[in-house]
């Protein structure tokens, strides 16, 4: 999904509407949070239509229709497989206790976690999610970025933060949100080479250790 997203954003920035929509469609077929790529395309399409007062070419309109088709097809396919074309996907999510409640469940989980002993994986999930929110705030408040990039990142952050029932998996939901690294990358360009190397090495080491722990020692699903 991340590759589809990166190239879709590039296609949007270069006004290759059908290529961007096709990649968004494929992203929606790979993972449910691929809807973020479709959201980026729809944001760009909406902006283009607003600027031209609806007089954009047929490719812009086609992109708006094609972009969410992959995600909608995925949802319908899950529904058909579960016996309820329209509600089956959401029933499956409910069965996994996965739901979107604007972060209420996550806040309750954090409150309970801070009130007593907790597993290392949960603590890391909280740390990574908090860092993601902070980086998103820096992204929004920093230099002006293209609307598709902001829309894509915002949807991924909202899904990760606002969802409940999968707290330990929140870092995985943020994996495709690579624009969150732009503020850090900008800061590293202004740092001394030794400091930049030290920061990158430390982050890479932390990522490697946490990944090894999550795959081998953690007693929880990621």
Give the ranges of each region predicted by the language model:
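Membrane-interface transmembrane helices that cradle and orient dolichyl/undecaprenyl
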Residues: 6-19, 188
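Transmembrane helix irregularities
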Residues: 12, 26-33, 81, 161-163
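Hydrophobic/aromatic-rich transmembrane helices and adjacent perimembrane loops
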Residues: 168-188
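Transmembrane-helix signature of polytopic, lipid-linked glycan biosynthesis machinery
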Residues: 151-169, 205-220
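Hydrophobic, aromatic-rich transmembrane alpha-helices
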Residues: 112-115, 119-146, 156-160, 178-184, ...
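Signature aromatic-anchored transmembrane alpha helix within multi-pass, membrane-resident enzymes
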Residues: 64-68, 190-220
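Multi-pass, polyprenyl lipid-linked donor-dependent membrane glycosyltransferases
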Residues: 1-7, 27-39, 170-176
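Membrane-lumen/periplasm interface segments of specific transmembrane helices
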Residues: 26, 34, 38-133, 148-153
């Amino acid at each position: 999904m991340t590759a589809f997203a990166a190239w879709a954003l590039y296609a949007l920035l270069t006004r290759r509407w059908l290529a961007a929509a096709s990649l968004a469609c494929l992203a929606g077929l790979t993972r449910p949070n691929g809807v973020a790529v479709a959201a980026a395309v729809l944001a760009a399409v909406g902006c283009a239509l607003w600027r031209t007062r609806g007089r954009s070419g047929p490719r812009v309109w086609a992109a708006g229709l094609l972009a969410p088709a992959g995600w909608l097809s995925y949802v319908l396919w899950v529904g058909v497989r579960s016996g309820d074309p329209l509600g089956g996907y959401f029933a499956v999510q409910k069965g996994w206790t996965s739901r979107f409640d604007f972060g209420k469940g996550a806040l309750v989980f954090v409150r309970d976690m801070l009130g007593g002993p907790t597993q290392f994986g949960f603590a890391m999930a909280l740390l990574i999610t908090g860092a993601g929110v902070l980086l998103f705030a820096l992204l929004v408040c920093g230099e002006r970025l293209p609307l598709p990039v902001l829309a894509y990142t915002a949807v991924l952050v909202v899904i990760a933060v606002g969802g409940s029932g999968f707290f330990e998996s929140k870092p995985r939901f943020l994996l495709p949100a690579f624009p969150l690294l732009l503020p850090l990358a900008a800061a590293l360009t202004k740092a001394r080479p030794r400091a930049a190397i030290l920061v990158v090495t430390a982050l890479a080491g932390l990522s490697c250790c946490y990944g090894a722990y999550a795959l081998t020692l953690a007693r929880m699903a990621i």
